[in-house]
Amino acid sequence: PGARADLRALQAAGVDAVMFGNENDRPYEFAVDTASTATMAYVVGRLRPEIAVPFGVDVLWDPMSTVALAAATGAAFVREIFTGSYASDMGPWTPDAGKALRTLQRYGRGDCAMLYNVSAEFADSLDRRPLPDRARSAVFSSIPDAV
């Protein structure tokens, strides 16, 4: 097992895209250690010649590391929580969608699709509007490519 075996199995099964993430990199951090992001970039770089479908990246809980990783690896998309305010077991969290989007553009990656998760796992939204209202608001105010 490992990233290469997973990639081969997913592509053999006919998936439309793959995503690389740090799902088991616990305990999670709001500002991920640079070594974690560098390691993810290394893994994607090693697998890049074998990737035959669009791929995305997600550094959980850290939108800025996510966009940096996308820029470094040539990812077609990112998925992360970029908007909202949350209470979590790690403390309060308020990502900055504008900063993430502008940083991605400064990296020359305006072509990288931004997929916004608007319902955080392991955290409670401090915004008490119903989820569909929060999603509509994110679409209007933060211009994601998809939610």
Features from the language model and the residues they span:
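Alpha/beta enzyme core
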Residues: 1-29, 38-53, 62-147
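Charged, often glycine-rich, active-site loop that binds/positions anionic groups
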Residues: 34
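Acidic carboxylate-rich catalytic motifs and surrounding loops in phosphoryl-/glycosyl-chemistry enzymes
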Residues: 59
